[in-house]
């Protein structure tokens, strides 16, 4: 099928998805399988930047969701001690041998789990980590130990996801956009970016920064407030906002936020170490 015919078939199946079952055969199953293979190979991507705007291809998410209706639970080999897992989604690496890994050109150490339909580009390093279905990890990225890349998330070139960092996934609600981490970003250990937040090129998040769609990202120098995105080449640390007084007049609880402590240009970002960028400067 051509891409337009795939899209038409998937969208029609989605409108009548209650009729899509384990017994469904023919064009619908073939279209879903073609999309999963295309996502896995990097031919398709759930979100792409067109000009200066990120565009989400919802029909590809529809295909991923339809696959859950089409595929039954089945044993998945490879669990510790010779045990098996029980799932609808096979490993990306199922059936791979040395030649396939060499051709793929990335490194996957023991404990790295990648589900089918996630795309891993050449030059990526996967430490013991988890990459969910429909996600895309671009060349040169490091997915460090216990980091997670959620469903359909987009990880740019040379991104470093530090130990235990979490990038939220999104399949439902359908209209929600995926988390996007643009090229050359650094996400500190145990930080979490979720709910469709866009982290723009070259941004640095320190350890323990939590950003969702409603989190206020405040530029300390200008007072400007961002929600849903982190501006390019921002250096961001955890912060808090004073809470409103309680009804009895006593101070209320503070609210978490993220604070932009400085901004750097591309040249500085490429030359200065992450530790130096995160070291606060006297006001």
From Swiss-Prot:
Pathway: Amino-acid biosynthesis; L-lysine biosynthesis via DAP pathway; LL-2,6-diaminopimelate from (S)-tetrahydrodipicolinate (succinylase route): step 1/3. SUPFAM superfamilies: Trimeric LpxA-like enzymes. The keyword Iron does not apply. It is an enzyme of class 2 (transferase). It catalyses: (S)-2,3,4,5-tetrahydrodipicolinate + succinyl-CoA + H2O = (S)-2-succinylamino-6-oxoheptanedioate + CoA. Keywords: Acyltransferase, Amino-acid biosynthesis, Cytoplasm, Diaminopimelate biosynthesis, Lysine biosynthesis, Repeat, Transferase. HAMAP family: DapD. NCBIfam families: dapD, PRK11830.1. This is 2,3,4,5-tetrahydropyridine-2,6-dicarboxylate N-succinyltransferase. The gene is dapD.
